[in-house]
Amino acid sequence: MTANVLFPLFANLHDRAVLVVGGGKVAERKTEALLKVGALPIIGAPSLTASLQHWAETGRITWRQGTFENSWLQEDIWLVIAATDQPEVNHAAARAAHAQRLFVNVVDDIALSNVQVPAVVERGPLRIAISSGGGAPMVARYLRQQLESLIDDSWGRLTTLFAQRRDTIRARYPNIEARRRFFETQLTGPLQRLLRKQRHAEAEAVLEAALAETPPTGSGSVTLVGAGAGDAGLLTLNALRALNEADIILYDRLVSDTVLQVARRDAEQIEVGKSATGHSVRQEDIHSLMLQHARAGQRVVRLKGGDPFVFGRGGEELEFLRTHNIPYEVIPGITAALACAAYAGIPLTHRDHAQSLCLITAHCQSSLDTLDWAALAQERQTLAFYMGVAGLPTIQQRLCEAGRAETTPFALIENGARAQQRVLTGTLKTLAHTAQTYAVRPPALLILGEVTTLAEHLHWFGTAPLSAPCPPALIL
């Protein structure tokens, strides 16, 4: 065991005197942290920052004006923090503290310190401390930033709820194993989900019911999660959380393997995909699966490509769940138009080219027949057609008939935001020919409008856009 291995320890400094040697910005940050935990900071320095001066004038801190003196340690000090930019002063404070067997932290000096102040993530009473032992503080700070984004405020509220009922929980579950099982159930059950939704009163009722052994029936739930267009890196933090808490994942055919790989390993994954050529799983059967597993008390994730509310039938599924009193939540995803355009270097709106964006589903002939083609033929707008590979000849014909210029540029993005991404460009006149020449297959998104010309020099992901030569029959 090496000498610099630290023992993790949280200290109660409430109403305890802590000497901070230094009056600059670093000392100010340390003092602010001490004030948050109710400590009694004594600041020793010739001068103070404006904030430290204000705290001294308002009685929040005590100021010992001058250069460090050993007598400053004769005030029932519990901890010493040396935070000056003068090594000789820091050394003097550390030597004096060591002589009196006090804990001392010298900022950025491992050798002189016998305690380190860690990087901290705070959520109410919940505190997570990270330390590199003083050897690599930037690593600790980086990890803190990662945790800050992963741990939401609901964990602080949950900690408070448990703390308020600590004695009740211990009395109800005197056996430590039974108590552990109770906590595990609450940490992964509806209580936490309600807190995330800011439904605090309902969360308290759930906890009280659990303690009274009358948990509400049907405690399972369904979460509609947008999986984005393919790249697992585009999942939101809430989507990752839901996938890691799921018991059952009902996923669409177009959800990528890389997304499924980040899910909880022991979750059951069931494909419920559809295709343009035929429905492999009926929507009614998907409804039944959600209902069956939620009523069994399981956490169901309905994982959809893109965003659940953009051509994903998410609204229908929520209406069904509401009718059957199944708790639900929705986690949005990056819809295909946004992801594919971004990965192809195409701004969907642009001051010089397009002031509006229209998202269109083209998955079957009946969908195309109901569109207002005259409106879609207007200039200075971007059109994004979803699920339109089979309907490309019809799209080309109807837009041209409605007056959209044959020279209108397009980009056809196959496997957008995935390693296999391919971007094909051309003009409306050559749309169907380009798709046939390159044997385009779903998933593919059609973006039509002047903005697509920017892909030629703004592309950054994968290979450069391709363009099929115009056949003689199409040349005027």
Curated annotation (Swiss-Prot):
Pathway: Cofactor biosynthesis; adenosylcobalamin biosynthesis; precorrin-2 from uroporphyrinogen III: step 1/1; Cofactor biosynthesis; adenosylcobalamin biosynthesis; sirohydrochlorin from precorrin-2: step 1/1; Porphyrin-containing compound metabolism; siroheme biosynthesis; precorrin-2 from uroporphyrinogen III: step 1/1; Porphyrin-containing compound metabolism; siroheme biosynthesis; siroheme from sirohydrochlorin: step 1/1. Its EC number is 2.1.1.107, 1.3.1.76, 4.99.1.4. The keyword Lipoprotein does not apply. Residues 1-207 are annotated as: Precorrin-2 dehydrogenase /sirohydrochlorin ferrochelatase. It holds the Pfam family Sirohm_synth_M. The active site is at D252, K274. InterPro entries: 4pyrrol_Mease, 4pyrrol_Methylase_sf, 4pyrrole_Mease_sub1, 4pyrrole_Mease_sub2, CobA/CysG_C, NAD(P)-bd_dom_sf, Siro_Cobalamin_biosynth, Sirohaem_synt_dimer_dom_sf. The modification Phosphoserine is found at S132. This is Siroheme synthase. Then it catalyzes the NAD-dependent ring dehydrogenation of precorrin-2 to yield sirohydrochlorin. Finally, it catalyzes the ferrochelation of sirohydrochlorin to yield siroheme. GO terms for biological process: cobalamin biosynthetic process; methylation; siroheme biosynthetic process. Keywords: Cobalamin biosynthesis, Lyase, Methyltransferase, Multifunctional enzyme, NAD, Oxidoreductase, Phosphoprotein, Porphyrin biosynthesis, S-adenosyl-L-methionine, Transferase. It comes from the Bacteria. GO terms for molecular function: NAD binding; precorrin-2 dehydrogenase activity; sirohydrochlorin ferrochelatase activity; uroporphyrin-III C-methyltransferase activity. SUPFAM superfamilies: NAD(P)-binding Rossmann-fold domains, Siroheme synthase middle domains-like, Tetrapyrrole methylase. In the N-terminal section; belongs to the precorrin-2 dehydrogenase / sirohydrochlorin ferrochelatase family. It catalyses: uroporphyrinogen III + 2 S-adenosyl-L-methionine = precorrin-2 + 2 S-adenosyl-L-homocysteine + H(+); precorrin-2 + NAD(+) = sirohydrochlorin + NADH + 2 H(+); siroheme + 2 H(+) = sirohydrochlorin + Fe(2+). Residues 220-476 are annotated as: Uroporphyrinogen-III C-methyltransferase.
